[in-house]
């Protein structure tokens, strides 16, 4: 698992390879990832936007931005946890992802919360990226 802490908001990522959706002979490699966001701060926040940097093993970068996550913009009161799962296809057997969530307090303050860098490694790889 990979962890990042920003302003007492913790983001934990657990990536996993989806063999049944992958087809290495067609250069299709698919990973899922589970994310848990815990608000350990003293203020409520809403996740309003996301930013991902996805880099394959050849250095090809794909940047993804958009509102919320999986169609939601969850509000986390102090002590709340939000969990979701998503996925990422690549054309190479390994890659790296990192990013941030833009959060907004009830008072309208916007700030970024780091998503830790995590590696996407196919089973059986001799060299891993992270």
Curated annotation (Swiss-Prot):
Name under which the protein is recorded: Protein ApaG
Pfam families reported for this sequence: DUF525
Organism: Rhizobium etli (strain ATCC 51251 / DSM 11541 / JCM 21823 / NBRC 15573 / CFN 42)
Stored SUPFAM superfamilies: ApaG-like
Signal peptide per UniProt: none
GN (gene name): apaG
Superkingdom of the source species: Bacteria
Region (Disordered), start-end ranges: 63-83
InterPro entries: ApaG_domain, ApaG_sf, Uncharacterised_ApaG
UniProt-listed NCBIfam families: PRK05461.1
Chain ranges of the ApaG domain: 3-127
Gene Ontology biological process: error-free translesion synthesis
